[in-house]
């Protein structure tokens, strides 16, 4: 176990806390029944990052973390500071202030080390028309210093993972947009990085290509335990692949955390600290009659009906919701669905951001 650092007198851990390599973890009071859960170190940590262009604060005191196996959506409108932040993480720009760390290595003080453990896929990347797929990957493997069997193994690994093996001899300027994006991802993976930064990887792809690329990114996190930071304007796509997100606007992080945490904050912002929720109720028939009945019930507001489906706000908790459903059934309404509406990532984005541009 790591040696505990000295702490100030006014900043002591309580008796039921210990310090792991990353965070404080509370343990059971009974020493005979201690279950210690070690918290993973962040593989990507952004600390108070700033990038100014004259008076424009493109990145303004940005901080967030990401861990192994996470796919983090980096979300914001055009001009919010996403690409500038990503370029700093990729060591392509220096910050005005602050720092970021990839697997503990500073992008400011140790950029060479960072480049060896980070893969960056920009929104557009160069392709050389006189190369085929395998020659293109070979070029980047050599650029990372791979030689002999190590280089051949790296190329084969990428061809198999991206399912480009059958296109290995195909000229890259004849590839479809979807296959070109797979090649770009393969180039990013050639040195087997721990952290991946993907800037709009699904831009311009047809629906099938987007789904296939999404599946590949999911495999990187779930099976290979990579950390993935991904930006996109297609929020429905991010909502299906990401388990965490950081929302940025006008250079500032508005909220970051797991998707569930962000949805909870969105609900809190929209409704304060009440127990209200949006309910969805579907009946087999009698939808118009059900609508009139629901409007007469306590805690109900904002009722909307689409054929046999009702959506309405309910200003009370779980027990009154259960009672409402019970009374619906007692009234012989043929209810086949009754649930809280799940807010999408797009709902959260619209609720949290204010449409500010720089």
Region spans (language model):
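Conserved ABC ATPase signature
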Residues: 171-178
């Amino acid at each position: 176990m790591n040696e505990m650092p000295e702490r100030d007198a006014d900043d002591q851990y309580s008796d039921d806390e210990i310090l792991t390599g990353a965070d404080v973890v509370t343990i059971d009071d009974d020493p005979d029944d201690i279950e210690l859960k070690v918290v993973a170190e962040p593989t990507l940590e952004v600390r108070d990052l700033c990038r100014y262009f004259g008076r424009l604060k493109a990145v303004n005191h940005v901080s967030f973390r990401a861990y192994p196996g996470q796919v983090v959506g980096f979300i914001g409108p055009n001009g919010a500071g996403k690409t500038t932040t990503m370029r700093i993480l990729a060591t392509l720009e220096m910050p005005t202030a602050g720092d970021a760390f990839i697997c503990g290595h500073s992008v400011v003080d140790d950029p060479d080390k960072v480049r060896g453990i980070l893969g960056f896929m920009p929104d557009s990347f160069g392709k050389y028309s006189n190369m085929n797929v395998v020659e293109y990957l070979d070029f980047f493997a050599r650029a990372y210093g791979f030689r002999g069997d190590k280089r051949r193994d790296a190329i084969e690994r990428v061809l198999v993972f991206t399912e480009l093996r059958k296109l290995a001899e195909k000229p890259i300027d004849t590839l479809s947009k979807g296959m070109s994006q797979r090649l770009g991802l393969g180039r990013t993976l050639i040195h087997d990085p721990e952290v991946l930064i993907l800037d709009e990887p699904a831009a311009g792809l047809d629906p099938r290509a987007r789904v296939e690329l999404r599946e590949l990114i999911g495999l990187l996190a779930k099976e290979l335990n990579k950390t993935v930071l991904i930006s996109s304007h297609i929020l429905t796509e991010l909502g299906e692949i990401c388990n965490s997100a950081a929302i940025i606007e006008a250079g500032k992080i508005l909220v970051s955390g797991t998707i569930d945490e962000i949805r909870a904050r969105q609900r809190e912002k929209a409704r304060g600290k009440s127990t209200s929720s949006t309910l969805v109720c579907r009946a087999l028939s009698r939808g118009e009659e059900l609508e009139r009945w629901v409007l007469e019930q306590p805690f109900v507001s904002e009722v909307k009906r689409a054929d046999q489906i009702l959506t309405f706000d309910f200003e009370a908790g779980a027990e009154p919701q259960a009672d409402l459903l019970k009374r619906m059934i007692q009234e012989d309404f043929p209810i086949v669905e009754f649930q809280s509406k799940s807010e999408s990532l797009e709902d959260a984005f619209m609720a949290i951001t204010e449409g500010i541009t720089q």
